[in-house]
């Protein structure tokens, strides 16, 4: 079974790329979530920075409603991509997002924001 659920903050605005043209095009959003991961032995908070990718309708929602610093919940699966760069294989692990949840930002009153799920 390959399922992952995360809650974190976006480290910067999502990067959007469009593949194809016209009605056959689809969008890809890439973003990084800063996810709290407990505390170390000295009591300092640990943070994991998780790469995420969303396609199609989920990407469209992210593009419209999600910005740097926003709290976001995601459900998805872990995937590994690989490609060659300068003659070396590069391996990248990321979360392929299936659902998103726009969460309230405790430092900012976003009571007008609604949840979005795809």
Predicted regions and their residues:
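Single-stranded nucleic acid-binding surfaces, predominantly the OB-fold ssDNA-binding core
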Residues: 1-118
């Amino acid at each position: 079974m390959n399922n992952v659920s995360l809650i974190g903050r976006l480290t910067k605005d999502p990067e959007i790329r469009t593949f194809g043209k016209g009605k056959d095009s689809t969008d890809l959003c890439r973003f990084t979530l800063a996810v709290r991961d407990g505390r170390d032995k000295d009591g300092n908070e640990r943070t994991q920075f998780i790469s995420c990718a969303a396609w199609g309708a989920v990407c469209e929602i992210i593009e419209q409603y999600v910005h740097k610093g926003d709290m976001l919940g995601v459900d998805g699966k872990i995937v590994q991509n690989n490609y060659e760069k300068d003659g070396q294989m590069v391996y990248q692990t990321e979360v392929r997002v299936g659902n998103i949840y726009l969460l309230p930002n405790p430092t900012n009153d976003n009571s007008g924001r609604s949840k979005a799920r795809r």
